[in-house]
Amino acid sequence: MSQPATHSDAEPATRLVLEQLSCERDDRLLFSGLSFTASAGEIWQITGANGAGKTTLLRILVGLHGFYEGERQWWQPQWQQQLLYLGHEPGVREELNPLENLRYACALSQQGGDPMAALAAVGLQGFEEVPAAHLSAGQKRRIALARLWLDRKAVWVLDEPYTAIDQDGVAALDQQIQQAAEAGTLVIYTSHHQVGDGVRRLHLAHGQAEVTEGGRV
């Protein structure tokens, strides 16, 4: 398996700046006045009850939701080329097998690496050619997560990545996220599961956003 690329020390440390971000949905305020700065090598955990706006916030960050007020600024004009976004749904094509799904996703995002090794890393060795329609929800989630074992992007935005994976999968994902951050990747994810110590936490509740655990507002 090829080694994931690391990021040059010459690149700016700041990856993302949000200033006074606000969003409503169905005439209900999700969050207001959200401001924070996220930098290379940081892990940000976004928490909140169902409906608090976690997924909406991630979709704003990656450019899939345009109905908001405030400023969202990434570190470079071509930021989308250096972004890996995994949504709440696995995004797997049922008619394709895991290997075909992974190759298809990599072609769309211009992501390199060894798909066979990535599938083995997430416990899908031996299932590479089984149609996704015949796999469990957890196995489909692992197909999506396998992209985290390919050539590394500068930013990972992950919506509930721990859904439908077993204890071994959780441990492997924890390790991969921590290693990515150590190599300079900014990781932003939604989950009630905390990856480890030093994680910056953003909690959404009652239209407000609170940054804790060392997050800079």
Swiss-Prot record:
UniProt-listed InterPro entries: AAA+_ATPase (IPR003593), ABC_transporter-like_ATP-bd (IPR003439), ABC_transporter-like_CS (IPR017871), ABC_transptr_haem_export_CcmA (IPR005895), P-loop_NTPase (IPR027417)
Source organism, top-level taxon: Bacteria
Transmembrane segments: none
GO biological process, one term: cytochrome complex assembly
SMART domains, per database record: AAA (SM00382)
Topology relative to the membrane: Peripheral membrane protein
GO MF term set: ABC-type heme transporter activity; ATP binding; ATP hydrolysis activity
Reaction(s) this enzyme catalyzes, per UniProt: heme b(in) + ATP + H2O = heme b(out) + ADP + phosphate + H(+)
Protein keywords: ATP-binding, Cell inner membrane, Cell membrane, Cytochrome c-type biogenesis, Membrane, Nucleotide-binding, Translocase, Transport
Pfam families listed in its UniProt record: ABC_tran
EC class name: translocase
EC number: 7.6.2.5
Domain (ABC transporter): residue spans on this chain: 16-214
GO cellular component: plasma membrane
Keyword ATP-binding attributed: yes
Residue sites binding ATP per the record: G48, A49, N50, G51, A52, G53, K54, T55
Main subcellular localisation: membrane
UniProt-annotated location(s): Cell inner membrane
PROSITE patterns: ABC_TRANSPORTER_1, ABC_TRANSPORTER_2, CCMA
Alphabetical list of PANTHER family matching this protein: ABC TRANSPORTER I FAMILY MEMBER 1
Oligomer and partners: The complex is composed of two ATP-binding proteins (CcmA) and two transmembrane proteins (CcmB).
Function according to Swiss-Prot or TrEMBL: Part of the ABC transporter complex CcmAB involved in the biogenesis of c-type cytochromes; once thought to export heme, this seems not to be the case, but its exact role is uncertain. Responsible for energy coupling to the transport system.
Family, similarity comment: Belongs to the ABC transporter superfamily. CcmA exporter (TC 3.A.1.107) family.
Protein name stated in the entry: Cytochrome c biogenesis ATP-binding export protein CcmA
Biological source species: Alcanivorax borkumensis (strain ATCC 700651 / DSM 11573 / NCIMB 13689 / SK2)
Source taxonomy: Bacteria, Pseudomonadati, Pseudomonadota, Gammaproteobacteria, Oceanospirillales
Gene from which this protein is expressed: ccmA
